[in-house]
């Protein structure tokens, strides 16, 4: 398989798992493997340049009841990135070009200790049934994200698969894939195939009633790109409300324009939660609501039906995020907020949410928590490392950075903002991967495209990589 590796260089996977080769002026030549601690840098999906600037920092997480509140930014005197950086040749055993006589010792790095909260308890969502309407392929593609928050929770998951050509074997295979991830998925076809996928998000109410059990207290309707960083936080949210009364919980859009146009309602991408008494009230009115409502959006149909046939009012939860913003959402993710839900992460903006939130498995409330190092660097845990050329003050950090399109128009819903950092004022390393390695967590942050001169004096791109290696005291 051919892949781009660097300007003027193409990399090939050799057959039978024997390694890699790259094209060169004298033909193909083999790529020498890196050490086991560094070989991950050559993964095809990372798309790194042949030569990279590499830094590693070891972080020791110490569980503490006194861990600083997320409302403030914890300050650390020492720099985050440290003084050591190596330029590695990924096509030549990941050898250091900058210090050829000093081999890179990937296992040793400058340590730093951070106080963090303990992991959240295991979530029990056995009283919740989640429902979605989407295509077979999107359900297949979304297994890593659904696994993060559904696996092992005991929740029921019902999916209307809207493809005309889907077969029983397709549905059985999909259920087996989810079962392998400890998710109880039931797939069904629409009871009315004339409805589009948006209408199916409301019509699914009938099915959710039919497939609920005596344990089911809550019904949740979501989009296929709704993501909950912490299932425990969702269980706590629901536990704080009365499931024996008609209850309607959700999040408004952050866009004033969307709320003005679509209305004051629970927006579906943020997650809509209803108690069983409310769903039972609506069940007999589904066909009438489909016939009467002007809107054809599932969340709008649901809201109109609730307003027309019940006395239940919306309980709006700020942490449930529709994220109706386009472009660069780094300002949101770097603001220190702990989101209950995220949306549009693979369409209106791009964020590897399942990899980002992996840190929450180790220190719960520390996901997207901020630490300030040496006056100029901010770690937004799980998302980015930002280095500010002129430093950054607490007053500036108290304001969300308006990085996305027309961001200043969101101040009414998201609070006062600061302007986006000017060109060259902020250097951002974004997380591209996170994985457990022998009980530790490795986070990989990348800054693409920094320039340098190659051996022939030509300017070439060179990516920068920061590896954070998290360890926790065993047995804590």
Describe the function of each predicted region.
Residues 226-309, 313-324, 332-337:
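Conserved catalytic core of nucleotide-sugar-dependent glycosyltransferases
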Residues 138-142, 193-202, 227-230, 267:
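Phosphate/oxyanion-binding active-site loops and adjacent basic polyanion-contact surfaces
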Residues 122-125, 144-157:
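Short, acidic, metal-binding catalytic loop of nucleotide-sugar glycosyltransferases
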Residues 142-147, 162, 170-176, 201-202, ...:
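Short coil/turn segments at secondary-structure boundaries
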Residues 215-225, 306:
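Short beta-strand-to-loop acidic/aromatic patch adjacent to the donor-nucleotide binding site
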Residues 161-218, 232:
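Active-site-proximal specificity loops/subdomain of glycosyltransferases
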Residues 1-112, 121-124, 307-476:
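C-terminal catalytic/acceptor-binding lobe
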Residues 127-137:
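A conserved hydrophobic helix/loop-capping motif in glycosyltransferases and polysaccharide synthases
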């Amino acid at each position: 398989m051919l892949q781009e590796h660097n300007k003027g260089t193409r990399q090939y996977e050799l057959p039978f798992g024997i390694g890699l080769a790259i094209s060169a002026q004298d033909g193909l030549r083999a790529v020498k493997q890196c050490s086991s601690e560094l070989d991950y840098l050559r993964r095809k999906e990372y798309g790194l340049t042949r030569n990279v600037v590499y830094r590693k920092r070891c972080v020791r997480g110490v569980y503490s009841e006194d861990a600083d509140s997320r409302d403030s930014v914890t300050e650390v005197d020492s720099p985050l990135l440290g003084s050591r950086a190596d330029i590695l040749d990924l096509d030549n055993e990941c050898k250091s070009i900058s210090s050829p006589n000093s081999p890179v010792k990937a296992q040793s790095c400058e340590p730093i200790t951070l106080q963090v909260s303990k992991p959240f308890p295991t979530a029990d969502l056995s009283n919740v049934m989640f429902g979605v309407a989407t295509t077979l392929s999107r359900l297949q593609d979304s297994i890593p994200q659904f696994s993060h928050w559904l696996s092992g929770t005991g929740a029921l998951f019902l999916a209307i698969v809207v493809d005309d050509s889907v077969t029983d074997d397709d549905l059985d295979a999909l259920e087996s894939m989810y079962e392998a991830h400890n998710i109880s998925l039931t797939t069904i076809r629409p009871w009315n195939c004339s409805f589009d996928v948006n209408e199916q998000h409301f019509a699914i109410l009938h099915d959710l009633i039919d497939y609920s059990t005596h344990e089911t207290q809550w019904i949740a309707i979501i989009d296929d790109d709704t993501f909950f960083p912490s299932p425990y936080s969702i269980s706590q949210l629901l536990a704080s409300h009365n499931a024996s009364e008609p209850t309607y919980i959700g999040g408004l859009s952050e866009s004033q324009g969307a709320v003005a146009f679509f209305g004051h309602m629970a927006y579906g991408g943020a997650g809509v939660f209803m108690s069983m008494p409310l769903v039972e009230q609506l069940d007999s009115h589904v066909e009438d609501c489909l016939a009467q409502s002007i809107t054809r959006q599932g969340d709008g149909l649901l809201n109109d039906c609730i307003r027309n046939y019940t006395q239940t009012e919306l309980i709006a939860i700020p942490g449930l995020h529709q994220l109706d913003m386009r472009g660069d959402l780094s300002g949101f993710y770097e603001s220190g907020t702990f989101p209950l839900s995220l949306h549009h992460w693979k369409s209106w903006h791009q964020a590897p949410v399942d990899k980002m939130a992996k840190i929450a498995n180790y220190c719960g409330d520390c996901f997207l928590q901020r630490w300030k190092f040496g006056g100029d660097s901010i770690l937004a845990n799980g998302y980015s490392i930002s280095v500010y050329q002129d430093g950054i003050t607490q007053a500036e950090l108290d304001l969300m950075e308006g990085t996305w399109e027309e961001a200043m128009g969101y101040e009414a819903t998201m609070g006062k903002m600061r302007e986006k950092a000017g060109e060259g004022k902020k250097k951002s390393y974004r997380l591209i991967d996170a994985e457990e390695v022998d009980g530790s967590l490795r986070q990989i942050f990348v800054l693409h495209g920094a320039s340098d001169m190659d051996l022939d004096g030509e300017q070439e791109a060179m990516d920068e990589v920061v590896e954070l290696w998290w360890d926790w005291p065993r047995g804590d």
